[in-house]
């Protein structure tokens, strides 16, 4: 439910004690004016509550039907709109809502309990990507291998051309040594050069 309700009302609520003031307006004008208002949900519900009680919940006698026949189309639109915004929304039992949330949580945990470890890790990767700054003590799936896989395609744009540009060598060297699984993709001479210079650089993944 949005925090505000935007209403284009073809029925004007005339501030009085009687909800059927709608009809007093109808009797003096050939066409109803359009009133545009931007109301908070609570303001909308409070303002038009009397109209809802009178038109949507009151008993419709033959006399009442005859009296308001000219605005029946408007009433037909107003009643479900008000009910959706103000009545159905507020009838949620707090206890039922709590139980619903607990049941939903149980369904999620049951699903996780039935998953294999690798499947669970893959599911977690979709929720929290294995970026280099992902803390493995907080997110256990953020292992070095997971971080390497996450960065792999991006790093290949810079680190696997026929010749690596000088400005990228520092980062490529650190990445390949931190993600040694992929170092065999380099040609032997480049791999040897990276290994021989590794001691002078830090660890990409900390």
Swiss-Prot record:
Protein name, entry field: Delta and osm-11 homolog protein 1
One Gene Ontology cellular component: extracellular space
Gene it is expressed from: dos-1
Listed InterPro entries: Notch_signaling_modulators
Molecular function GO labels: Notch binding
GO biological process, one term: positive regulation of Notch signaling pathway
Transmembrane segments: none
Source organism: Caenorhabditis elegans
């Amino acid at each position: 439910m949005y925090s505000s309700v935007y209403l284009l009302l073809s029925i004007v609520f005339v501030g009085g004690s009687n909800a059927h003031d709608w009809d007093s307006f109808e009797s003096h004008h050939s066409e109803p004016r359009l009133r545009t208002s931007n109301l908070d949900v609570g303001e909308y519900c409070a303002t038009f509550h009397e109209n809802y009680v009178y038109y949507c919940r009151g008993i419709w006698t033959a006399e009442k039907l005859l009296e308001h026949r000219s605005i029946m189309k408007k009433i037909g639109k107003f009643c479900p709109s008000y009910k959706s915004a103000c009545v159905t929304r507020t009838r949620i039992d707090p206890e039922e809502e709590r139980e619903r949330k607990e049941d939903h949580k149980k369904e999620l945990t049951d699903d996780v309990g039935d998953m294999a470890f690798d499947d669970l890790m893959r599911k977690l990767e979709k929720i929290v990507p294995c970026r280099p700054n992902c803390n493995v003590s907080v997110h256990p799936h953020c292992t070095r291998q997971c971080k390497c896989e996450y960065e792999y395609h991006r790093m290949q744009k810079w680190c696997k051309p026929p010749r690596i540009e000088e400005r990228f060598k520092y980062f490529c060297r650190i990445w390949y040594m931190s993600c040694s699984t992929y170092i065999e993709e380099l040609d032997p001479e480049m791999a040897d050069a990276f290994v021989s210079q590794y001691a002078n650089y830090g660890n990409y993944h900390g």
